[in-house]
Amino acid sequence: MTAPSGSTPDVDVVVVGAGPSGLTLANILGLQGVATLVVDERDTLIDYPRGVGLDDESLRTFQAIGLVERVLPHTVPNQILRFFDADRRLLAEMAPPDARFGWPKRNGFVQPLVDAELFGGLERFDHVEVRFDHRMQSCSETAGGVTVTFDGDRDPVRARYVVGCDGGRSTTRRQMGVSFDGTTSSTRWLVVDVANDPLGHPNSEVGADPARPYVSISIAHGIRRFEFMIHPDETDEQADDPAFVRRMLGQRVPYPERVDIIRHRVYTHHSRIAGSFRKGRLMLAGDAAHLMPVWQGQGYNSGIRDAANLGWKLAAVVNGQADDALLDTYDLERRKHARAMIDLSTMVGKVISPTNRGLAALRDRVIHAASVVPTLKRYILEMRFKPMPRYQQGAVYHDAQPSPTSPTGTLFIQPRVDTREEFNVLLDDVLGPGFAVVCWSNNLRAVLGDEAFDRWKGLGARFVEARPMTQLHWPGYDDADVEVVGDRTGALKKWFDVSTDSVLFVRPDRCIAGACIAQRAPEVSTALFAVLHLTREGGAGSHGEKSDGTVLHVAQSAAEPSGTSAGTP
């Protein structure tokens, strides 16, 4: 079905899939006033956990959408992960001590409860609707938008953009006609979620035992996940047998017959990435864009990164602040990092789960030898191996010959600061939901110049001057448009000292779009307006007027019973 090119969209964005990526994206769009429709083929949210680990970047995103305080009660912060060999000798430990982005790096969590909080957050917006029991059938793109049709007698919907957050078997991806390149492991695992944790300790472990590798993860609220490798001569039917499940649990607990099993299932690991994250007015996020093994707990978090990266860009285009070309930077920025996460997760899985005793023994000797080297031990302990976003292309501006210490393309830190009115607040709460221009102890209006200052102000940017605490209340060049913050922990002074750049242009997703010394701020600001595809006037986007129609949010239907398996490609 094709809509006439001049048809007025019913909504700005259709999000296909009410999983974590789709719900996070809908919250971001909702906060920016974007008329959004979320559709899902199920009749309710999935009620069983898939992901079990939240990282600091995801919590920072939940902070940005105003839901972190509702999420935190369902988490286990600062969760330690230990790796043991077959004799239960410690191979490695991950216990990252810092919280440079404002939150712990490793957190166990109960996904259904966190997803429910994301879903509940949409009740804040009259212009966001969720429709369950809507299976997308097709997308027909025109110059003016996309017409989405559904199975049955559901009415079609016209939108300006469609984002597929519809999982590994994504219908959106098939409609786009893009590949899903990669591999599916031949190794199968039995995952068992249990209530009333029979172990009861707060942390997690991986048993790298070649006889049968296993995982034991404390989630939250007394829930624990066990995972056991299934041998090649064991069928899926055998692994699904309750007696087999109890036998596996008996390897880890003394009374397996007393364990309260919530759910068990057999799954395999996928290492796949879509050929493109964008094609015209259709985009992909979350598992629809990439699948990765569980070993780094980054599948869920990578989907949240997608939403954070894409959300502000979609809102800027729909609201007329940027041209459509800004959306091309989504694929440029997210693809490389998602690929790095897939590769790391795949590699860690190969290290953890060899069943050849000779290879496992060699691995153990190498790791034990490396652990006596302090720098290598810290590298693992502090999770320094985790790939961090560093965008060389996209919605960022780099000098022709950038300094090796340039922070451009990386995430800005989030220490706690003082303002003149509040104490001990997280920096992002001062920076606000949009763009921010940040400097170290300088007159920001004078540094930028009136033209650049006014243009950033017209885009809703906030201006923040960071100072030593001794200067917090000095009124020398106070400006009503500039928020002064005191560096209560010293983290900002240390950060600016290392980077050497003193003026930062920070995107809504907290990536540093550009950085420079004070004297170059006007020219870097001008260059950024070009690479960010920002419009000077802030009128309509490149594809017609913004839709001013709104849709109402509907309540969630009754809970779906357990037993539905996640799809595989």
Swiss-Prot record:
Record family assignment: Belongs to the PheA/TfdB FAD monooxygenase family.
Pathway: Aromatic compound metabolism; 3-phenylpropanoate degradation
Name recorded for this polypeptide: 3-(3-hydroxy-phenyl)propionate/3-hydroxycinnamic acid hydroxylase
EC number: 1.14.13.127
UniProt binding sites for FAD: 12-41, 277-287
Function recorded in the entry: Catalyzes the insertion of one atom of molecular oxygen into position 2 of the phenyl ring of 3-(3-hydroxyphenyl)propionate (3-HPP) and hydroxycinnamic acid (3HCI).
Gene giving rise to this polypeptide: mhpA
Cofactor(s) this protein requires: FAD
UniProt entry tagged with the keyword ATP-binding: no
Broad enzyme group: oxidoreductase
Catalytic reactions on record: 3-(3-hydroxyphenyl)propanoate + NADH + O2 + H(+) = 3-(2,3-dihydroxyphenyl)propanoate + NAD(+) + H2O; (2E)-3-(3-hydroxyphenyl)prop-2-enoate + NADH + O2 + H(+) = (2E)-3-(2,3-dihydroxyphenyl)prop-2-enoate + NAD(+) + H2O
A Pfam family of this chain: FAD_binding_3
Gene Ontology molecular function: any one: 3-(3-hydroxyphenyl)propionate hydroxylase activity
GO biological process, one term: 3-(3-hydroxy)phenylpropionate catabolic process
Entry keywords, A to Z: Aromatic hydrocarbons catabolism, FAD, Flavoprotein, NAD, Oxidoreductase
InterPro entries, alphabetized: 3-HPP/3HCI_hydroxylase, FAD-bd, FAD/NAD-bd_sf, PheA/TfdB_FAD_monoxygenase
Upper lineage: Bacteria, Bacillati, Actinomycetota, Actinomycetes, Mycobacteriales
